């Protein structure tokens, strides 16, 4: 479906190109993308997975499992980890069976699960980058 389309390859879509251009300008130590839904964390790929401990720390905090994907799906995180070779994570929030309005209705659950994520990322950058 169109809602699942992320592009043919990293940086193929205008909104992704704009975000990539901004990222190249500011050169962050890591990227953290939030999407809905699934209650999972996607880190780099099996062959490009810099700093897997960051995903594991966030997984321990949120209770969401962390996975490496087998290859690029064309998204922002995919582009970032393969060009910067720095940590890039996508956190999918909300139960898979929830509709998008249900995610909004359950935002207190989502926020509670993700309360420590930014602190974990900041500590990680301070200690490792």
What kind of region is each of these model predictions?
Residues 1-52, 56, 90-102:
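Active-site/substrate-binding loop(s) of hydrolase catalytic cores
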Residues 65-73, 124-129:
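Low-complexity, flexible helical/coil segments
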Residues 25-31, 61-65, 85-87:
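Loop/turn elements at helix/coil->beta-strand transitions in domains of secreted/extracellular proteins
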């Amino acid at each position: 479906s169109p809602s699942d389309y992320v592009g043919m390859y990293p940086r193929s879509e205008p909104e992704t190109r704009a975000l990539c251009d901004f990222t190249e300008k500011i050169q962050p130590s890591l990227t953290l993308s939030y999407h809905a839904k699934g209650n999972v964390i996607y880190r780099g790929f099996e062959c490009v997975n810099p700093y897997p401990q960051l995903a594991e720390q966030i997984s321990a905090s949120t209770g969401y499992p962390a996975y490496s994907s087998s290859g690029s799906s064309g998204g922002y995180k995919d582009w970032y980890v393969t060009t910067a070779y720095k940590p890039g994570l996508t956190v999918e929030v909300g139960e898979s069976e929830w509709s998008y309005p249900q995610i909004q209705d359950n935002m207190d659950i989502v926020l509670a699960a993700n309360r420590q994520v930014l602190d974990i990322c900041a500590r990680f950058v301070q200690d490792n980058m």
